[in-house]
């Protein structure tokens, strides 16, 4: 994790800079006025990773300056949730005098939630044995007795020890409704919980008058699929990463949503299947008949690289397109294609990553008349 200067006095200034930059970037597309969704000014980040430095009897978190590569001590991290900040000193204090817990520990990863759960992964340059398990269980109990709802994982080369479970349960509020999400260690989750809620509300608002079904590519753990299901008859969603697909299935069941179907496929393979160029056994096994779906709307949330040309062409076949982007540069490249057939009717900036140059954008497109 890189150095990050969190300065609440500068928050509005940096947000105004992003607003201006994003508006300027997309001015050629005749976009509507930008809708801007703010982040909390501090304690907004639900996860954080720190290296661990050992100095005599002392042990503390460090980060590295991106430019000079020099390490610096981190006792508190204002970007991270209050839960992470509360736990940071208690965790090192509890491990400092225990040889099996601190020996060759080199990194600590935190995954926290708005719901109050937190998961800690301890990474070691050695194999972990029975003594570590006993001491880690005692550590977990000690911290839970102090009021945390915590789970612990030990990791080493080709080794992962889960004391209880390797995930947290997050609860996000969307227009007064609470959605349950399983978030698994080391899999993608939205880092800024409060902004994630605003993104879901925006997506629900954009699609509230929808007819027919929704197709979603790159659905992750079902983050958007579940909230959007209320606006569609059915939702068909694709995701390639196996842990994310498993989480999505868990989340569908936990939220008692019955009109969402997840398939484990890449967007590229799904494009081939939709065009009827090839049959896929996994679609047959899941008893999914693509022809039975009436998808007028497509939702895409691609990786930083954006969508390839073939996927863009396939996406153009839908009346309405919702595109969430973590990289405005590749969004712009994709819009060069999509804007040939569609107009942008909603345009949003979500400040997922305050005090950095990163911008999360949302566009809603409708087929030209």
UniProtKB/Swiss-Prot annotation:
Keywords: Methyltransferase, S-adenosyl-L-methionine, Transferase, tRNA processing. One of its GO terms (cellular component) is cytosol. GO terms for biological process: tRNA methylation. It comes from the Bacteria. Its EC number is 2.1.1.-, 2.1.1.35. The keyword Methyltransferase applies. It catalyses: uridine(54) in tRNA + S-adenosyl-L-methionine = 5-methyluridine(54) in tRNA + S-adenosyl-L-homocysteine + H(+); uridine(341) in tmRNA + S-adenosyl-L-methionine = 5-methyluridine(341) in tmRNA + S-adenosyl-L-homocysteine + H(+). S-adenosyl-L-methionine binds at residues 190, 218, 223, 239, 301. GO terms for molecular function: rRNA binding; tRNA (uracil(54)-C5)-methyltransferase activity, S-adenosyl methionine-dependent; tRNA binding. Dual-specificity methyltransferase that catalyzes the formation of 5-methyluridine at position 54 (m5U54) in all tRNAs, and that of position 341 (m5U341) in tmRNA (transfer-mRNA). This is tRNA/tmRNA (uracil-C(5))-methyltransferase. It comes from Vibrio atlanticus (strain LGP32). The lineage of its organism: Bacteria, Pseudomonadati, Pseudomonadota, Gammaproteobacteria, Vibrionales. The gene is trmA.
């Amino acid at each position: 994790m890189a150095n990050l200067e969190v300065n609440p006095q500068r928050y509005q200034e940096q947000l105004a800079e992003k607003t201006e930059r994003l508006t300027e970037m997309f001015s050629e597309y005749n976009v509507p006025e930008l809708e801007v969704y703010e982040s909390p000014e501090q304690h907004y980040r639900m996860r954080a990773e720190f290296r661990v430095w050992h100095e005599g009897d002392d042990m503390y978190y460090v980060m590295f300056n991106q430019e000079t590569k020099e390490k610096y001590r981190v006792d508190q991290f204002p970007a991270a949730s209050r839960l992470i900040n509360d736990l940071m000193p208690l965790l090192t204090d509890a491990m400092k005098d225990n040889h099996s817990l601190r020996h060759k520990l080199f990194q600590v990863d935190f995954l926290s939630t708005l719901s109050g759960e937190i998961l800690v992964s301890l990474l070691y340059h050695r194999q972990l044995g029975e003594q570590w398990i006993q001491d880690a269980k005692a550590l977990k109990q000690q911290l839970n007795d102090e009021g945390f709802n915590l789970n612990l994982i030990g990791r080493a080369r080709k080794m992962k020890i889960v004391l209880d479970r390797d995930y947290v349960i997050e609860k996000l509020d969307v227009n007064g409704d609470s959605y349950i999400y399983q978030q698994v260690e080391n899999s993608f989750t939205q880092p800024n919980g409060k902004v994630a809620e605003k993104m879901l509300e925006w997506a629900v608002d954009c699609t509230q008058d929808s007819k027919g079904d929704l197709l979603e590519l790159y659905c992750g753990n079902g983050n958007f699929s579940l909230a959007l299901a209320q606006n569609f008859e059915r939702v068909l969603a694709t995701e390639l990463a196996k842990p994310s697909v498993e989480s999505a299935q868990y989340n569908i069941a936990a939220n008692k949503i019955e009109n969402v179907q997840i398939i484990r496929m890449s967007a590229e393979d799904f494009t081939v299947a939709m065009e009827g160029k090839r049959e896929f056994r996994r679609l047959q096994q899941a008893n999914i008949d693509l022809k039975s779906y009436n998808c007028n709307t497509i939702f895409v949330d691609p990786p930083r690289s954006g969508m390839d040309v073939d996927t863009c062409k396939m996406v153009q076949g839908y009346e309405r397109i919702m595109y969430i982007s973590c990289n405005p540069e590749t969004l712009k490249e994709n819009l060069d294609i999509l804007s040939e057939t569609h107009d942008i009717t909603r345009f949003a900036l979500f400040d997922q990553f305050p005090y950095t140059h990163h911008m999360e954008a949302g566009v809603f497109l409708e087929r030209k008349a």
